[in-house]
């Protein structure tokens, strides 16, 4: 007990007086500070804010987890037909007459996406759909009369496109911002970037990297070179001045030079990509129209990107062969022909010519002669005689009768309207006589 009493005495001496007086009766040199307390209302406000933030976070997670319609479903698309080696045979327009070919993100050269982000929205992966600093900069430049600066992010540009928003007014800009937040809440960054690359304007009636690469460079987006990728990266910012019929103008060259400087700042090892290395660009008028009959057939059966089995060199050879034969036999009245070349091992079509001239209406050139229905006629006769030989019904020197004969209600005639009497099987086949052929057919038994 004495021990606890001594401890209490020591503790009493160490603690300052509760009355505020010192041990000697003077004013205390220090006071024990009161325990801080928060106002009741402030505590409730913090709780409510935390609850609202948590609820918003959970709502965003649930919204992202819900199944969403693919962004690709926002439009209709072109179709592209390629040969076996990837050569473009045909690029069609979409139902709205736009060249727009949906190309998955993984089939777009990575340098294209990187260049687009460096030029259009370098903070894309970090902002929530809107870049406040860029918007403030753009607004300041607009109201101060300076050169206008773009403040729209990739997400905002995509929202304007797919929701058809007029962002030139303040109300429209607010709608665009809200739509960008809505997109970011529902789709991943990669989904949004993929959709932007497929909907970005490239001048005239060209939309998206997939269609632009085929029109301007006649190659798929996966095969673009660095200069070509940098070219496509700068067109969407001002498609009227840099794309379409104006491709290759000073406006495009200037923008491409700026883009090259930005790129080289991060990738100095990629030199040279200056103005003298600018890629040659084509127009939509130069799009190929190869193997038209085959392309038409494939387009009736499918859409999107279609890969044919034909070989361009074989196709060109077959087309030349048909053209030469028609020219050689023109005096004989032959004006049209069709042919198909099939690999006997794989049964793949390697070349197909449906007519002598697809654009010649006098010969119904757009009709695919390879698929046209026709009577087999005399083409069956060799098979009839061959089967008769196999079954022992006759041999080449067997004498047959070429005379008026009725086979039930059917009385065949010959192409020349005449009958020549007794004839060997060999001569009957060589001279394509109809009555002997039908006579042989009646002797055949059904093959096992």
Feature names for model-found ranges:
Residues 107-139, 364-386:
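Active/ligand-binding-proximal structured segments within catalytic/core domains
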Residues 87-101, 211, 241-244, 298-301, ...:
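Short pre-catalytic segments that frame enzyme active sites
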Residues 2-14, 45-84, 123:
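N-terminal type II signal-anchor transmembrane helix
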Residues 154, 162-163, 169, 173, ...:
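Active-site-adjacent helix/loop patches that line small-molecule binding or acyl-intermediate pockets
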Residues 65-113:
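Terminal hydrophobic membrane-targeting helix
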Residues 20-22, 43:
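Glycine-biased, low-complexity coil/linker segments
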């Amino acid at each position: 007990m004495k021990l606890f009493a001594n401890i209490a005495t020591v503790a009493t001496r160490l603690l300052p007086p509760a009355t505020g007086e010192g041990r000697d009766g003077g004013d205390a040199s220090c006071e024990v500070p009161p325990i801080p307390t928060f106002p009741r209302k402030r505590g409730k406000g913090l709780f409510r804010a935390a609850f609202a933030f948590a609820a918003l976070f959970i709502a965003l997670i649930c919204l992202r987890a819900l199944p969403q319609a693919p962004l690709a479903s926002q439009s209709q698309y072109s179709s592209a037909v390629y040969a076996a080696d990837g050569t473009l045979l045909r690029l069609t327009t979409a139902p709205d007459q736009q060249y727009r070919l949906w190309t998955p993100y993984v089939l777009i050269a990575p340098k294209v996406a990187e260049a687009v982000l460096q030029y259009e929205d370098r903070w894309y992966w970090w902002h929530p759909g809107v870049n406040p600093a860029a918007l403030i900069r753009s607004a300041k430049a607009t109201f101060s009369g300076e050169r206008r600066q773009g403040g729209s992010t990739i997400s905002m540009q995509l929202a304007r496109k797919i929701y058809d928003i007029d962002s030139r007014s303040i109300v429209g800009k607010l709608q665009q911002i809200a739509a960008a937040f809505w997109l970011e809440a529902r789709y991943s960054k990669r989904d949004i970037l993929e959709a932007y690359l497929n909907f970005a304007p490239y001048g005239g009636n060209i939309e998206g990297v997939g269609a632009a690469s085929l029109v301007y460079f006649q190659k798929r987006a996966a095969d673009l070179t660095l200069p070509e990728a940098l070219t496509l990266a700068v067109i969407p910012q001002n498609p009227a001045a840099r794309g379409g019929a104006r491709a290759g103008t000073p406006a495009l060259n200037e923008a491409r030079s700026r883009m090259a400087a930005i790129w080289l700042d991060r990738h100095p090892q990629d030199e040279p990509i200056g103005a003298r290395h600018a890629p040659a660009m084509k127009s939509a008028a130069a799009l190929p129209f190869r193997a038209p009959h085959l392309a038409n057939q494939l387009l009736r059966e499918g859409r999107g990107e279609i890969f044919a089995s034909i070989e361009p060199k074989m196709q060109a050879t077959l087309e030349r062969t048909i053209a030469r034969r028609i020219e050689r036999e023109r005096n004989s009245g032959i004006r049209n022909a069709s042919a198909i070349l099939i690999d006997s091992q794989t049964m793949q079509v390697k070349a197909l010519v449906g007519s002598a001239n697809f654009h010649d209406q006098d010969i119904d050139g757009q009709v695919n002669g390879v698929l046209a229905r026709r009577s087999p006629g005399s083409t069956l006769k060799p098979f009839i005689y061959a089967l008769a030989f196999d079954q022992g019904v006759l041999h080449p020197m067997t004498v047959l009768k070429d005379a008026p004969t009725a086979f039930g209600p059917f009385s065949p005639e010959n192409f020349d309207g005449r009958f020549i009497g007794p004839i060997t099987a060999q001569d009957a086949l060589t001279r394509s006589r109809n009555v002997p052929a039908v006579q042989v057919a009646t002797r055949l038994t059904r093959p096992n």
